[in-house]
């Protein structure tokens, strides 16, 4: 269910944005890993590394040097946890691309895309992130209250807020600085 929703949203959202013409939809469409400059892919690694242990711990899964242990022997729960984390990453991926590719030239099929950096566009992209969060959270909250999955969805909100923080407060011509701020914000908090 989670995988199906994430797939639909990942395909549908760029076209909805394109229709409203508020954000450069091409910038979202090119957020596939194959087109990532390496430093744009790093935030995904950070999200995965920092998020998976937190969510697994909330489910009673613990990782030791000897392997993976579980207080609950139903390993399918752990797989559902990981699937949900991947779902969150897929939702965050387009928005993080918008943030960390500011001022970076992307070449796809010899088409040069330079993302705009005005404050107005950055504010719009931040609002877009909250729209994504509004779509994702009900699914995660539903899993919590139904007892299917106990996941710390506040961590997901925290990642959105971190991205918005880096997007609005860091100079628009410094994507590397944005990346450093994102790392610090996630690890410190």
From Swiss-Prot:
Keywords assigned: Cell membrane, Membrane, Transmembrane, Transmembrane helix
GO cellular component: plasma membrane
This protein's record includes keyword Membrane: yes
Major localization listed first in the record, in broad terms: membrane
The keyword Ligase is annotated on this UniProt entry: no
Name the UniProt record assigns to this protein: Uncharacterized protein AF_1268
Disulphide connectivity of cysteines: none
Species, as recorded: Archaeoglobus fulgidus (strain ATCC 49558 / DSM 4304 / JCM 9628 / NBRC 100126 / VC-16)
């Amino acid at each position: 269910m989670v995988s199906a929703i994430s797939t639909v949203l990942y395909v549908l959202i760029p076209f909805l944005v394109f229709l409203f013409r508020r954000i450069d939809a091409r910038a979202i469409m090119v957020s596939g890993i194959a087109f990532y400059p390496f430093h744009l892919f790093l935030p995904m690694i950070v999200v995965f590394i920092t998020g998976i242990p937190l969510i697994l711990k909330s489910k009673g899964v613990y990782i030791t040097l000897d392997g993976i242990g579980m207080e609950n022997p139903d390993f399918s729960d752990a797989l559902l946890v990981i699937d949900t984390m991947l779902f969150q990453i897929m939702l965050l991926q387009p928005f993080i691309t918008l943030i960390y590719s500011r001022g970076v030239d992307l070449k796809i099929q010899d088409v040069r895309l330079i993302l705009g950096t005005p404050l107005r566009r950055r504010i719009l992209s931040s609002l877009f992130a909250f729209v994504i969060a509004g779509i994702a959270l009900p699914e995660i909250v539903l899993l919590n209250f139904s007892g299917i999955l106990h996941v710390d969805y506040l961590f997901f909100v925290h990642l959105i807020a971190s991205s918005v923080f880096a997007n609005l407060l860091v100079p628009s011509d410094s994507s590397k600085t944005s990346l450093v701020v994102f790392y610090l914000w996630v690890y410190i908090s």
